Every structure is written in C-alpha cells, then in structure tokens.
C-alpha cells in the first residue's frame, strides 16, 4: 500500500516538474521572441539639421576620390539556371533610360521638351518585341538577328535594318535577385518644393500651378517613392539613406530591414521638407561613404545607390563630365547607381549624360501610382545587372553600320562596332515577346558590292567577371520591302517616330525669330532678355518652362508620321501605339 502511494506521489511530482519545464520554456521562448522582434528606429535626420557636410570643388575634378584601376567583384546567383526551350525565359533590356515619362508629361502640360526627354531605349522599354529566332545555347546571353528592308514614309526610299534580339537563357521560375545593400540619396533642395506639373525656376509670376491649387509637390512624391521602395525590400536586405540640399546629411545608417522599425522610418521620411540649394556632389559622396569595407566585401549582396532628384545641381561640382566620373568610380567598385527623376522640370540632359555607365539606369516619374507600378513590375530587374561591356563586331563587304538605336552607349557605336554598357533582365509577355528586348541597327549598303554575307561577333562580361564570346554568319540577300518579324518592324516604327520628334526639337531650337530663341541647355528664351543675362540668372543645369511650339512645317510632318503609325498599329496589332498617335494629334493641334 505504501509503495503504491509513493508511486502516485512520484508520478505527481514528475508531472509537476514536466509542466514547470514547459511553462518556463514557454516563458523564455516568448521572452527571446520579444527581444528578437524589438525593432530599431535609427533615424538621424531632423528638419532642423545644422550639421551639414559640404563638398566644395576647388578644381574641375572636385575633391571626390576617384579610385584608379579598381574593378568590381561580382558573384554568381546560384539560384539562376539555364532553361530548356520549352520553358519561358527572362528577357533582357539595355540600361540607361527606362522610360520617356518626362517627355510625355511636358507635352501633356503644354511645355516644350528638350531632346534628351525622349530616348530610343527609353521608348523601346514601353513596348514588347519579338526578338527573333535564336541559336541553341547555354550561355547567359544569346543574341538573335533579324533583318528588314523598309520604305521610309516621307522619302519613300528603301532603308536597310537589322535588330539584335536580347535573349537570356535564365528560366523565369529560377530568376531571383541577390540580397541588396540599398542607399537612397534624396534631393531635398528648394526646387523640390514646386508642383509636379510646374517649373521651379519660372518663379511665381510664370508658375501656372500655384500653391493654392494644392498640387502635390516633387518633395511629397519623392518621400512617397522612398517608402514604396522600402516595401520592395526583404528582411535580409539592408537599407540606408542620405539627404542633400546645399550640404549633405545622414538620414539613416545602413542596417537590415528585419532589424528596423519600418513604420517609424516611413513616418520620418514623410516629414522631410524641401529647402536650400542643390549640391549633388555632397549627397552622392556621403551616400558612397555608407558603403564601408564590410558591406563591399559581403559577396552575398549587390550594392546600389538610388538617387531621387529633379536633377538641377547648382552647388559643388555641377559639370556633367565631372559628375560622370563619380558614377564611374562607384561602378568600378561594384556600387551601381539608379536615378529616379521627379517633376516635369526633371533635367534629363544631366541624367542622360551621367547614367550611361556600367550598371546604371534611370526612370522619370509623375505620380505615386505610376512609380508603384514600375516597382511592382521592375524592381527586381532594375537592381540586377546581368551583362556588362557588350561589344558587337560587324564585318561585311556589302554593308556597314550607319546608326545604332536603343543602346546606352550610342556615342561609342559606329562603323563596324556596336557597344552596350549593361543589359538588365526584363519581363516577357504571353507571346514570349520581351520588354525593350531589341537594339536596332540601320545599315548602309555599300556601292557596287554584291557580297551579302555578314559576320557578327559578340563579346561580353557576365556578373561573375567571366568573359564570353560567340559568332554567327548571316546573309542579307533581299531587295524588296520585307520584315523578318514584328519585332524589327515595331523597332523601325518607334525609331522613325523618335527621329521625327528629335528633328522637330532641333528645328525649333535653331529657328530663332523675332518672338524667341532657343538655347541648348535652357530652352526657349523670350527676346526681352539677352542670352548673357539669362545665363547669369540660371545655372547650367536649371530649367525654365517653354510654351509648346510647333511650326506649320512640322505639323505637316507630324500628320505624315501619324498616318504611318496608324497603319503600322493595325499591321502590328499593337494598341499601345495609340499613346504615340494621341501625342502627335496634340502636337498637330497645338
């Protein structure tokens, strides 16, 4: 009997002990979880900030340190693998300009654009292209080539074209971006306080969108854009932030998203106000300084600075060639740069000049909804350069390259060479067409030559730093109008459209009359002001608005190109071309 009672007692004690262990374990587990879940609000900036960091330039090269002979160290993405022909693949597109929103917004609001507002590669990225039949390959990049003879709609002369189809062999299901070290460099200068639809340097008298109309400012959209970008980051991504006006400020040190009180950080960002001058050099340098050796040596991460600005630097280094050196220096260290341009007065000329660098790209935005769409479709692609330093060597007795359209390095492409700084991944649609997936070459047929053979040799560097090359032979033996596929036809249509618009801008710029003259950097200037006076008032990168102007001669040209686009829209069955037709209609009725 005693033994039975002892056994029961022991059983009760054991049960109590087990329950106690469970309770204690549960307590400590929850305690640890609570500690783990504690988030850090590491925001450093205040709108009353006084500890500015200035960067002054005592020479044309500035004080920014440009490393010599450095190279980026790229690591491979083990998640990426090559596809079989039966599975859809990721497309490829050129870096640099990724849309033409600034051009469209200027026309929409009745302003005269500058030529860099519309780019070939930016417009191509608004459309999907059939890239042509590609050869069997397991290489990361697999080019395809398509040919066409097309009659010019204005001159009626036959023109010869070839597209380079930008194909990858990465499966859509296997594509995954690397973890990111992202530093946002935010422009908080006074010009960011103006309305999205107005030009800051017009002044109050010319500003057609007054504060009383309560239009959203560039600063408000920029703040919202940062928060939208944060939403795209994962817990194992890192994020930091710098702000600049006439000086530079630390907004937030680089830290893991998972350790950060994101709600608090977002609230701080929405409180940011615009003020002061625009010292891009100071902001970019301070943003670069956040990438210490520990970050740069962590090969699980890619590194990127994202600059959000209206691109009108007027303090520190303002020369575009010198600013370009800073972007190139970072690229050589494996720190790549993206630009997000805000406002109708976003200076595309500045960004177009400094973004044609390995790993760089830029977008212009005009609304929160538009940027949200860009991020949802493109964020993983915009931070993942795949192909660098692409060279195409074109050898033919019968043809030579006359012009290259749609690269981020057009100034280095001519004769027998086509160059591209960077290819980024791009989406494909249900028809296996690739977004922005071509480069168009206009060819010149040599006189008295009957040899139609063309040898095309491609070389490039992948993100691991490995060099690749391949070669193909093709024949161009057609004499009458034809298009090998819809991709090359669409590329020709869009190129002729851009050519007409750029020609119009240059024509109006050179057409000085009694009413106005047009300056290359400033735009249309009323003749009440002398050119030297305007240059003294405005900095080299500051834009004033210009009323939309179309001469009768170009209205007739626009009618012809509009009719051409309407016909090609039907042939291509692409209703997206309606946006270009509508824009031409506005210009015709201007």
Predicted region positions:
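Short, aromatic- and glycine-rich surface loops/edge beta-strands on solvent-exposed regions
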Residues: 441, 453-460
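Exposed acidic/Ser/Thr-rich ligand/metal-binding surfaces
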Residues: 21, 152-388, 446-449, 580-590
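Solvent-exposed residues in well-ordered beta-strands and their adjoining turns
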Residues: 167-169, 395-397, 444-446, 461
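Von Willebrand factor
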Residues: 6-216, 220, 228, 232-233, ...
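N-terminal Lys/Arg-rich, disordered targeting/topogenic segments
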Residues: 1-5
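Polar, glycine-rich mid-to-C-terminal structural blocks
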Residues: 336, 358-366, 372-377, 383-430, ...
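Low-complexity, intrinsically disordered segments enriched in Ser/Thr together with acidic residues
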Residues: 432-449
């Amino acid at each position: 009997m005693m033994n039975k009672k002892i056994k029961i007692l022991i059983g009760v004690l054991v049960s109590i002990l087990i329950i106690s262990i469970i309770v204690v374990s549960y307590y400590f587990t929850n305690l640890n979880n609570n500690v783990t879940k504690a988030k850090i609000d590491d925001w450093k900036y205040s709108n009353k900030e006084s500890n500015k960091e200035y960067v002054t330039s005592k020479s044309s090269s500035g004080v920014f340190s440009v490393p010599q002979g450095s190279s980026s160290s790229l690591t491979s993405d083990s998640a990426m693998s090559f596809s079989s022909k039966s599975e859809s693949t990721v497309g490829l597109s050129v870096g640099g300009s990724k849309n033409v929103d600034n051009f469209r917004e200027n026309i929409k609001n009745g302003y005269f654009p500058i030529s860099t507002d519309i780019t070939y590669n930016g417009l191509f990225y608004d459309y999907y292209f059939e890239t042509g039949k590609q050869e069997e390959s397991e290489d990361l990049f697999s080019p395809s080539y398509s040919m066409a003879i097309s009659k010019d709609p204005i001159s009626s002369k036959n023109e010869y074209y070839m597209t380079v189809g930008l194909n990858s062999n990465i499966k859509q299901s296997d594509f995954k971006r690397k973890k990111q070290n992202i530093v946002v460099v935010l422009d908080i200068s006074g010009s960011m306080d103006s309305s999205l639809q107005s030009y800051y340097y017009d002044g109050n008298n010319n500003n057609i969108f007054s504060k009383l109309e309560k239009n959203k400012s560039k600063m408000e959209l920029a703040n919202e854009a940062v928060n939208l970008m944060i939403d795209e980051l994962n817990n194992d991504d890192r994020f930091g932030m710098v702000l600049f006006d006439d000086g530079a400020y630390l907004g937030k040190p680089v830290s893991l998203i998972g350790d950060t009180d994101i709600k608090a950080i977002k609230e701080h960002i929405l409180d940011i106000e615009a003020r002061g001058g625009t010292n891009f050099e100071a902001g970019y340098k301070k943003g670069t300084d956040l990438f210490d050796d520990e970050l740069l040596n962590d090969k699980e991460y890619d590194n990127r600075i994202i600059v959000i600005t209206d691109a009108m630097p007027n303090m520190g280094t303002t020369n575009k060639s010198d600013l370009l050196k800073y972007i190139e220096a970072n690229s050589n260290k494996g720190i790549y740069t993206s630009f997000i341009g805000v406002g109708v007065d976003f200076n595309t000329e500045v960004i177009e000049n400094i973004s044609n660098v390995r790993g760089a790209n830029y977008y212009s935005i005009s609304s929160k909804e538009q940027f949200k769409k860009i991020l949802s479709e493109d964020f993983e692609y915009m931070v993942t350069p795949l192909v660098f330093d692409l060279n195409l060597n074109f050898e033919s007795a019968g043809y030579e390259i006359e012009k290259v359209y749609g690269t981020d390095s057009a100034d280095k492409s001519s004769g027998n060479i086509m160059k591209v700084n960077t290819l980024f991944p791009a989406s494909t649609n249900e028809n296996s067409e690739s977004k922005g997936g071509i480069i168009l070459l206009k060819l010149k047929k040599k006189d008295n030559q009957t040899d139609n053979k063309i040898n095309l040799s491609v070389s490039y560097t992948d993100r691991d730093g490995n060099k690749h090359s391949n070669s193909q032979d093709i024949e161009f033996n057609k004499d009458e109008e034809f298009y090998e596929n819809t991709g090359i036809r669409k590329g020709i249509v869009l190129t002729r459209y851009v050519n007409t618009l750029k020609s119009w801008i240059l024509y109006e710029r050179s057409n000085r009359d009694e009413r106005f003259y047009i300056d290359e950097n400033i735009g249309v200037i009323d003749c009440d002001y002398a050119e030297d006076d305007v240059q003294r008032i405005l900095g080299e990168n500051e834009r004033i608005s210009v009323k939309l102007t179309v001469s009768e001669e170009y209205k007739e040209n626009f009618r012809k190109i509009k009719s051409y686009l309407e016909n090609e829209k039907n042939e291509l069955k692409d209703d997206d071309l309606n946006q270009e037709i509508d824009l031409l209609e506005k210009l015709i009725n201007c």
